[in-house]
Amino acid sequence: KMQDMPDVEIKKSLFTFTPKYLQLSETTVNIGKNDITADSRFENNIGYALKGTTLKGSLNIRSNYFNLNDFMPATGEEMSSSGDVTTTDSVSSTGIVEVPRNIDFQMDANLKQVLFDKMSFNNMNGKLTVKDGKVDMKNLSMSTMGGNVVMNGYYSTADAKKPELKAGFKLTNIGFAQAYKELDMVQKMAPIFENLKGNFSGSINVLTDLDAAMSPILDTMQGDGSLSTRDLSLSGVKAIDQIADAIKQPNLKEMKVKDMTLDFIIKD
């Protein structure tokens, strides 16, 4: 067991090693509560181990439960018991997940439940290419925030100090309130979502740098998109409630809108 890491248990594995390739068949590993099963084949494993040359591989990955938060490094700041922010000895460490430059992997993923930060993803499926410090995602589909998302794009740490995310999202029946609850970016850019009832669909394209906590840096963000909703209601906004009381129009406390489409552009 490694310090600050969950217990690792290899339940089963069929291991084949030759000078040309390394193959793992039906390898099942439990890391704490997390499980992962992989069929994989790696080439140039000796050159990778001895000379640091590129390791090539293909992987088919399956999992019932995988909590990415268990593997995120601590950031350089921690909250003290008094509530003050204190800097620890690991000030140089960040929560950035750095993609190795000397691997070339083709991956098929089928993950039943994935947790990351405050978000939960179910039935995540798609293809990923990991190469040159970059993860390309193709038709990565998942259920989240009450609806469904399909993602295409990339995450790059070619510059490890400035990770970059470029992604296109196709959204179907996402809950406004759930998006506000789970996405820090929505809380900062669209706090009104907290008071909206209903679902939305549409598409979003975004390019942004990421900070040490893997959150978008809003000053660098660019993008566009279109969102539509067929049944939307707004309530619980204090300022609107006060106006409704002042003019004696209680029906204004809950406003309803149908068949609305919003096109938008994001600029730094």
Protein language model regions, located:
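Small-residue helix/turn framework positions
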Residues: 1-42, 46, 52-79, 100-115, ...
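Intrinsically disordered, low-complexity segments enriched in small/polar residues
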Residues: 73-98
